[in-house]
Swiss-Prot record:
Keyword Protease part of the UniProt annotation: yes
Entry-linked HAMAP family: Proteasome_B_A
Organism expressing this protein natively: Desulfurococcus amylolyticus (strain DSM 18924 / JCM 16383 / VKM B-2413 / 1221n)
Biological-process GO terms, alphabetical: proteasomal protein catabolic process
Keywords assigned: Autocatalytic cleavage, Cytoplasm, Hydrolase, Protease, Proteasome, Threonine protease, Zymogen
Enzyme class name: hydrolase
InterPro entries: Ntn_hydrolases_N (IPR029055), Pept_T1A_Psome_bsu_arc (IPR019983), Pept_T1A_subB (IPR000243), Proteasome_sua/b (IPR001353), Proteasome_suB-type (IPR023333)
Protein name according to UniProt: Proteasome subunit beta 2
Substrates-to-products reaction catalysed: Cleavage of peptide bonds with very broad specificity
Amino acid sequence: MREAVSKTTTVGLVTGDYVVLAADKRATAGPMVYHKAVKKISKITDYAALTISGLVADAQYIVENARYIAREYEIEMGGPIPIKALASRISLILSVYLRYSPFIVQLLLGGRDSTGASLYYMDLYGSVTREKYMATGSGSPVAFGILEKNYRSDLSLEEAKKLAFNAVSSAIMRDGFSGEGVDIVVIGPGIYSEETIPLKKTIESS
């Protein structure tokens, strides 16, 4: 059985100089929950992270390649890879494999470089778009609705974290395949922070 994290909820949003990523922690294999503490936000560098939704093996391959691309760029160019360039390289991998064995993934790449904070959405076809906010996974209709209703470009960092949390926790309450708590990552000027909010607190806040 191929393990999947497509039945999930991940969100990302940009506010000022920060990007906030959030995801639930449950992973499924068919109708079964096989893990309740999965990290669906993978650190690529100290200034970039990738959320994953899709087949676990495919997502892990993309994450490892993204890390390699970022390290290679830093060695060759002597500085951090621009987030747009990293998104383009990841989308190229997706599109190259599309004709042979496509990666079953949806990805959100969030990060900060010399141009500021940014968020990119990529699908299995290799298409890439820059977004102010986005959601992926089975809980995305609920999460996106929350983001669309409440997002503002001038949100404070705390407001942005709360909105990301509310988007995922709302999806957890309505989507049987999302759950087990919320991971939140914040990337900003000199900052890469991670925190986990347990399921009990998630339910109490809803």
